[in-house]
A protein has these predicted regions:
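Rossmann-like dinucleotide-binding domain for NAD(H)/NADP(H)
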Residues: 84, 93-182
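Rossmann-like dinucleotide/phosphate-binding beta-alpha-beta segment
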Residues: 1-92
Length: 182
């Protein structure tokens, strides 16, 4: 059983906001080439900081990437964005990672692509509620499932608590909290 080195791989980040940029920062250290698809192209100074290449067309980006990382919010535009047609564009030796929302990927198509080895593997921090699909995903040797545990660290939870306190204080002071939900 042989693995593959990560140095020199191409990473396509879907959603280059705060989390996407944090991933780009870490990936760059490993010599990974950073590419991204986003609602809007980032300012040139941010692109230069990550040596990132913008792709307006999602399909054109996906078909050239070794790794695709989904980090965008779930909206009407992103729901189902990673369709069977997009998955079919991926290379057979490529991997897809979803740490965003399960509804962004057509999970039935993803299961088929993984079973047929049209995609090398998947890392899913989120997945749908359909029991049959979860069972199929769990039984795939080329898939890793962790139930939305990306922030399940002591430091992460302390940081979340501190943000809550800052947001409450900001609201009480009559200002708009940074992480407002409604």
């Amino acid at each position: 059983m042989l693995g593959s080195r990560i140095h020199g791989k191409r990473l396509g980040i879907i959603g280059m906001g705060r989390i996407g940029q944090a991933i780009a920062k870490r990936a760059k250290v490993f010599g990974i080439s950073i590419h991204y698809h986003n609602r809007n192209q980032l300012p040139s100074q941010i692109e230069e900081a990550y040596e990132a290449t913008y792709w307006k067309n999602l399909g054109e980006m996906v078909k050239r990437m070794d790794i695709v990382s989904i980090n965008c919010p779930l909206t009407e535009k992103t729901k189902g964005m990673i369709s069977e047609n997009i998955l079919k564009l991926m290379m057979p030796n490529s991997y897809i990672i979803n740490s965003s929302r399960s509804e962004i990927i057509d999970e039935k198509a993803l299961v088929r692509m993984l079973q047929e080895k049209k995609i090398a593997g998947a890392g899913l921090d989120v997945f749908g509620a359909e029991k049959k699909l979860k069972t199929e995903l769990l039984n795939l040797p080329n898939t890793i499932l962790i139930p939305h545990m990306g922030s399940a660290t002591v430091e992460g939870r302390i940081e979340m608590g501190e943000k809550v306190i800052v947001n409450i204080k900001t609201f009480i002071d009559g200002h708009n909290p940074q992480n407002r939900i409604i």
